[in-house]
């Protein structure tokens, strides 16, 4: 039973029978104030229903455009639009920061643009004069790289399906240790060499230790949300720099195209590994490990909060034009049907919405390959700023379109295909068409 505050400050108690009242057989309406009799209630109900029917006869489809027939496009649609824009900003800012860190490092630190080795996953070299042989080697490197990614993803899904959580945690902790300690040590050393900054080894070791220890605590246990997000962006940038340095040029572009296709298949196919991982997590009502996912809101993991399952409930109210006509909430705003959730114990009612907001989640692999594309554009070929900025804008446009599709389909979608496709198209078109045109134009001026 819900109580709505009318505009004339009269309180009416509406139950299920009164909310489903029809014009053909109006049910008597009970009112608790003012001594109003049943006859007055019937006449009031009939007047409201007739008025709504007359409005419906004028234009029966006037509210269909909002997506829900018979529902006015009011504040709820505006609220949805605001949250959509907020979610775009929540993901655009960290993606932008990650790409800025990578591009700034590529433009200033020569270590990450020097080719003095390759990954074990790309054994075929591209130092051949033959274009066909170079293309073949890049395709073979791509096949090996994608095969390794597929095998490791399936292995992770199998471990998660059989609840091997300790093994997964150990795997992720070892990866985080390598990124936060070893790769950070290498990165900091090269930055200090580039800018000719002297630092003794004890200070360097202490700095790396503090950085890595705090990162391990924030990522795998507890910590402020913004600090956790900053560490996830940092490890994504470090991993992207490793790929930029050790991936051959042609192999990098072919891998970017192939990984976007694989991401499409892995997420959208019924038996795709990433889709199975997401569906398994949803069935168990468990969050995916924070070390794999960037979240714009706090991700609750096992041990961070003890919630009472019996306290979580929802009440779905049916849509009733009569209630909507002069039903107002306690703040005087029009009240629309929605899902009311019981407050969790220990949280104030006014903070419930903020605490329950899950935010938007983006895989760290998407951060890495976005940054690889922009970093390769800045490091290889002409390396001019026009090409780099074109790839940067293309990735953000693709991310916005992906979020738009996410709002439409309301299910997990791959974040790489649109952004990587736009990035590759913008890179090759800018590098081969726009840049020569601008050089010629500047020469003749």
Curated annotation (Swiss-Prot):
Transmembrane as a keyword of this entry, yes or no, is yes
The subcellular localization recorded is: Endoplasmic reticulum membrane; Golgi apparatus membrane
Compositionally biased spans, kind Polar residues:
19-30
Where on the chain is Phosphoserine found, per UniProt?
Answer: 22, 25, 30, 52
Q: What is its EC number?
A: 3.4.23.-
Keyword terms, alphabetized: Endoplasmic reticulum, Golgi apparatus, Hydrolase, Membrane, Notch signaling pathway, Parkinsonism, Phosphoprotein, Protease, Transmembrane, Transmembrane helix
Say where the protein is mainly found: endoplasmic reticulum
InterPro entries this protein is in? Pept_A22A_PS2, Peptidase_A22A, Preselin/SPP, Presenilin_C
Q: Intramembrane: which ranges? A: 414-434
Q: Which GO terms describe its biological process?
A: amyloid-beta formation; calcium ion homeostasis; intracellular signal transduction; membrane protein ectodomain proteolysis; mitochondrion-endoplasmic reticulum membrane tethering; Notch signaling pathway; protein processing; regulation of calcium import into the mitochondrion
| GO molecular function term, any single one | aspartic endopeptidase activity, intramembrane cleaving
The residue ranges crossing the membrane are 88-108, 139-159, 167-187, 201-221, 224-244, 250-271, 362-382, 389-409
- For the region Disordered, give the residue spans: 1-76
User: Which stretches of this protein does UniProt put in the Cytoplasmic compartment?
Assistant: 1-87, 160-166, 222-223, 272-361, 410-413, 435-445
Where are the active-site residues found?
Answer: 263, 366
Segments on the Lumenal face: 109-138, 188-200, 245-249, 383-388
What is the top EC class of this enzyme, as a single word?
hydrolase
Q: According to its record, how does it sit in the membrane?
A: Multi-pass membrane protein
UniProt xrefs under SMART domains = PSN (SM00730)
Instruction: Spell out the Gene3D superfamilies in the cross-references.
Output: Presenilin
Q: In what way is this protein post-translationally modified?
A: Phosphorylated on serine residues.
What is the stated purpose of this protein?
Probable catalytic subunit of the gamma-secretase complex, an endoprotease complex that catalyzes the intramembrane cleavage of integral membrane proteins such as Notch receptors and APP (amyloid-beta precursor protein). Requires the other members of the gamma-secretase complex to have a protease activity. May play a role in intracellular signaling and gene expression or in linking chromatin to the nuclear membrane. May function in the cytoplasmic partitioning of proteins.
Q: Which family does it belong to?
A: Belongs to the peptidase A22A family.
> Domain comment, in the record's words?
The PAL motif is required for normal active site conformation.
Q: What is this protein called?
A: Presenilin-2
Q: Which organism is it from?
A: Microcebus murinus
- Gene it is expressed from: PSEN2
């Amino acid at each position: 039973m819900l109580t709505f505050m009318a505009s004339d400050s009269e309180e009416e108690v509406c139950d299920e029978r009164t909310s489903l009242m029809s014009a053909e057989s109006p049910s008597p309406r009970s009112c608790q104030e003012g001594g109003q009799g049943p006859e007055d209630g019937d006449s009031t109900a009939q007047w409201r229903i007739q008025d709504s029917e007359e409005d419906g006869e004028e234009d029966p489809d006037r509210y269909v455009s909002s997506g829900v027939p018979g529902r006015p496009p009011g504040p709820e649609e505006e609220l949805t639009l605001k949250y959509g824009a907020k979610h775009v900003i929540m993901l655009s800012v960290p993606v932008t920061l990650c790409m800025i860190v990578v591009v700034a490092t590529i433009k200033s630190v020569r270590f990450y643009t020097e080719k003095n080795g390759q990954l074990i996953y790309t054994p075929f070299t591209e130092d051949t004069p033959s274009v066909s042989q170079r293309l073949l080697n890049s395709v073979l490197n791509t096949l090996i790289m994608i095969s390794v990614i597929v095998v490791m993803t399936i292995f992770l899904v199998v471990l998660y399906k059989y609840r091997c959580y300790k093994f997964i945690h150990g795997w992720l902790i070892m990866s985080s240790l390598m990124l936060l300690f070893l790769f950070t040590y290498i990165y900091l050393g090269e930055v200090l060499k580039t800018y000719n900054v002297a630092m003794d080894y004890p200070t360097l070791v202490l700095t790396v230790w503090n950085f890595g220890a705090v990162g391990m605590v924030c990522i795998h246990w507890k910590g402020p949300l913004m600090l956790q997000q900053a560490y996830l962006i940092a490890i994504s940038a470090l991993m992207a720099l490793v790929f930029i340095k050790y991936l051959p040029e042609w192999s990098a572009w072919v891998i970017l195209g192939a990984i976007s296709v694989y991401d499409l298949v892995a997420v959208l196919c019924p038996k795709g590994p990433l889709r199975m991982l997401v569906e398994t997590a949803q069935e168990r009502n468990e969050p995916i490990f924070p070390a794999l996912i960037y979240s714009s809101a706090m991700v609750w993991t096992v041990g961070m909060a003890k919630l009472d399952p019996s306290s979580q409930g929802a009440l779905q109210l049916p849509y009733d034009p009569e209630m909507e006509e002069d039903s107002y909430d306690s703040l005087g705003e029009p009240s629309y049907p929605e899902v009311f959730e019981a407050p969790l114990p220990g949280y104030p009612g006014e903070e419930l919405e903020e605490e329950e907001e899950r935010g938007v989640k983006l895989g760290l692999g998407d951060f890495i390959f976005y940054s690889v594309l922009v970093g390769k554009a800045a490091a290889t070929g002409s390396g001019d700023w026009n090409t780099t900025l074109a790839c940067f804008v293309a990735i953000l446009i693709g991310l916005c379109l992906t979020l738009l599709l996410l709002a439409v389909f309301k299910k997990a979608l791959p974040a790489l295909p649109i952004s990587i496709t736009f990035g590759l198209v913008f890179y090759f078109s800018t590098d081969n068409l726009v840049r020569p045109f601008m050089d010629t134009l500047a020469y003749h001026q």
